[in-house]
Amino acid sequence: LYEVYQNKEDLLYEVVVMNDKRKKEEIEKFDKPGLNVINIVMHVLRLQTEEFNRVNPLFYEELGRYPKLRIYFADRENKEHEQLVDFIERGVDEGYFLSNIDINLYSSLTAASGDYIMANFLYNKCNYKEILKTFILLYIRSICTEKGIKLLDKEMADFF
């Protein structure tokens, strides 16, 4: 490995970048005509659950120790904010999300919750699916219209 990568930080960086690229491609492949934001949210959460079940939590804990990765994650968070704005606007247009959402505040709150979960190793104290279910109820269901709630509840019943 160290013939290709000079140090562990470079290796981890490449793994994270490649994994992010793979996830992005999978989501883009999934998003076909006829699907909506609720379908996509649940698909992404399924992928995250599968990944979390495959990866040792120590891996996630290790990532925050490297400056190059911290910079990458900060840049990724900015890009994800832009994608979130577009995604919520799409959900509003589709009639699944409320139109009176302060997207910047919403984005900050969801990011802070994710950071809290990781920084406090909540996944070691609670079942990951319970964390996910609570996250969905707090941050997805709360911005749904009645139409969105009905579909989300159905999707959640199938998932949980």
Can you say where each PLM-predicted feature lies in the sequence?
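Hydrophobic alpha-helical connector segments
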Residues: 14, 18-21, 25-54, 107-110
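C-terminal peripheral helix-coil segments that are non-catalytic and often amphipathic
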Residues: 86, 90, 94, 123-160
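HTH DNA-binding helix-turn interface
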Residues: 1-14
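Secondary-structure edge/capping motif, primarily at the C-terminal ends of alpha-helices
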Residues: 30, 59-63, 117, 121
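Amphipathic, non-transmembrane alpha-helical scaffold segments
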Residues: 12, 16, 20, 70-81, ...
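Helix-loop "lid/cap" segments that line or gate small-molecule binding pockets
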Residues: 43-50, 59-62, 137-143
